[in-house]
């Protein structure tokens, strides 16, 4: 997971490194071409100096002004080298060493040439040497402006290219390395990969140090919803009690009869039955109908067997049942 999160940054850094490496390779090629051109010019000058020395040896005369001539030539060559872009000696140490080596060889040859016998140093040879010196000065002064213009033009182009290209932060990190002699591309790539790995480790450590915030996911919410539905389903639902005022089956049937109109026909057909009437009850009816009867007669009761009884008060709230004779009864 961590590698997938870091991939975009790594790709950007690799692209930047690729661009920087391409720019460095082009710059190195240009510098190599310039160095090759300078070396060719220096070799041509050395050949010319050697040819001049041979010509002078053939002429057979070297004046005392010869050391001064060699110093003038060395000074001119140094000026040309400075015009060609060798102002910063820290970046180009090799040509300087070659230059000092050439001077050492020239100085080493000077005493050998000066130690020649004085007999050969006649006026004619001195005159010829002066003429030859003037010719050589003219021949060296003629290509100087062109070389100076070419060197200055190359230096200006080099500066313009550096100004147009905006330095990237990774290139700024390698300024110390650029001040030193150019290293091989493999070492450059190794250093850059190390710096990339360090930056990746720093970013990973920063991400790990940050605390993860509690985020409610969809699964947690769904679980809460299911729990709520289960708890609501477990609660018993209140059963609806039937209303007390509902009519019974008999009332409902009579209602339907009234609606259909069958109640009147049924009431007309029904007649009151007298089967439940007892014979003893009729005697009570006759007793109640009699007016002005005695209290005793009110207490007499008849039974279905035909015997009559009466209740006689024996005490406070007490009565006794006494059989009544038929003769004594009114």
UniProtKB/Swiss-Prot annotation:
Any one GO BP annotation for this protein: cellular response to interleukin-7
Q: How is it modified after translation?
A: Phosphorylated by casein kinase II, protein kinase C and MAPKAPK2. Phosphorylation by PKC induces translocation from membrane to cytoplasm. Phosphorylation by MAPKAPK2 may regulate neutrophil chemotaxis.
Residues the record lists as N6-acetyllysine modifications: 318
Q: What is its main location?
A: membrane
Where are the annotated segments for Disordered?
A: 1-246, 281-302
Q: Which InterPro entries match?
A: Caldesmon_LSP, Lymphspecific
Q: Which UniProt keywords apply?
A: Acetylation, Cell membrane, Membrane, Phosphoprotein
**Biased composition regions of type Polar residues, renumbered to the chain:** 66-77, 206-215, 223-242
**Composition bias, Basic and acidic residues:** 1-20, 37-62, 113-135
Q: Name one GO cellular component term.
A: plasma membrane
Offer one Pfam family short name for this entry. Caldesmon
Q: Where in the cell is it found?
A: Cell membrane
Please name the GO terms that the record assigns under molecular function: actin binding
**What topology does the record note for this protein and the membrane?**
Peripheral membrane protein
Q: What is the effect of changing residue 243 to A?
A: Complete loss of phosphorylation by MAPKAPK2, partial loss of phosphorylation by PKA, no effect on phosphorylation by PKC and CaMK2
Q: According to the UniProt entry, which residues carry Phosphothreonine?
A: 166
Biased composition regions of type Low complexity, renumbered to the chain: 291-302
Q: Which residues carry this modification: Phosphoserine?
A: 77-78, 168, 179-180, 184, 243
Tissue expression, as annotated, is: Isoform 1 is expressed in normal mouse B and T-lymphocytes and in transformed B-cells but not (or in smaller amounts) in nine T-lymphoma lines tested. Isoform 2 is expressed in non-lymphoid cell lines (myocytes, stromal cells, fibroblasts).
Q: Which PANTHER family match?
A: CALDESMON (PTHR18949), LYMPHOCYTE-SPECIFIC PROTEIN 1 (PTHR18949:SF1)
Q: What is known about what this protein does?
A: May play a role in mediating neutrophil activation and chemotaxis.
- This chain's protein is named Lymphocyte-specific protein 1
Organism, as annotated:
Mus musculus
Source organism phylogeny: Eukaryota, Metazoa, Chordata, Craniata, Vertebrata
């Amino acid at each position: 997971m961590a590698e997938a999160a870091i991939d975009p940054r790594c790709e950007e850094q690799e692209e930047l490194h690729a661009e920087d490496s391409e720019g460095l390779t082009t710059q190195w090629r240009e510098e190599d071409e310039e160095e090759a051109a300078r070396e060719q010019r220096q070799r041509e000058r050395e050949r010319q100096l050697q040819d001049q020395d041979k010509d002078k040896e053939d002429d057979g005369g070297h004046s005392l002004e010869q050391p001064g001539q060699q110093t003038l030539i060395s000074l001119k060559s140094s000026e040309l080298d400075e015009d060609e872009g060798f102002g910063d000696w820290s970046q180009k140490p090799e040509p300087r060493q070659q230059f000092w080596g050439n001077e050492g060889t020239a100085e080493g040859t000077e005493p050998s040439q000066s130690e020649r016998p004085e007999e050969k140093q006649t006026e004619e040879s001195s005159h010829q040497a002066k003429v030859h010196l003037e010719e050589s000065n003219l021949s060296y002064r003629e290509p100087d402006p062109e070389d100076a213009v070419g060197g200055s033009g190359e230096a200006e182009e080099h500066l313009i290219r550096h100004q147009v290209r905006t330095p990237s932060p990774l290139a700024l990190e390698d300024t110390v390395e650029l001040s030193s002699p150019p290293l091989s591309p493999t070492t450059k790539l190794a250093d850059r990969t190390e710096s990339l790995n360090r930056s990746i480790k720093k970013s990973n450590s920063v991400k790990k140090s940050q605390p993860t915030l509690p985020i409610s996911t969809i699964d947690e919410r769904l679980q809460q919803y299911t729990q709520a539905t289960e708890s609501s389903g477990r609660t018993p639902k209140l059963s609806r009690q039937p209303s007390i005022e509902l009519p019974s089956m008999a009332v409902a049937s009579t209602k339907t009869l009234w609606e259909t109109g069958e109640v009147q026909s049924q009431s007309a057909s029904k007649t009151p039955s007298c089967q439940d009437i007892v014979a003893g009850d009729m005697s009570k009816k006759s007793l109640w109908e009699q007016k002005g009867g005695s209290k005793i007669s009110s207490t007499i009761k008849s039974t279905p067997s035909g015997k009559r009884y009466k209740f006689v008060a024996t005490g406070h709230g007490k009565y006794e049942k006494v059989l009544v004779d038929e003769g004594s009864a009114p």
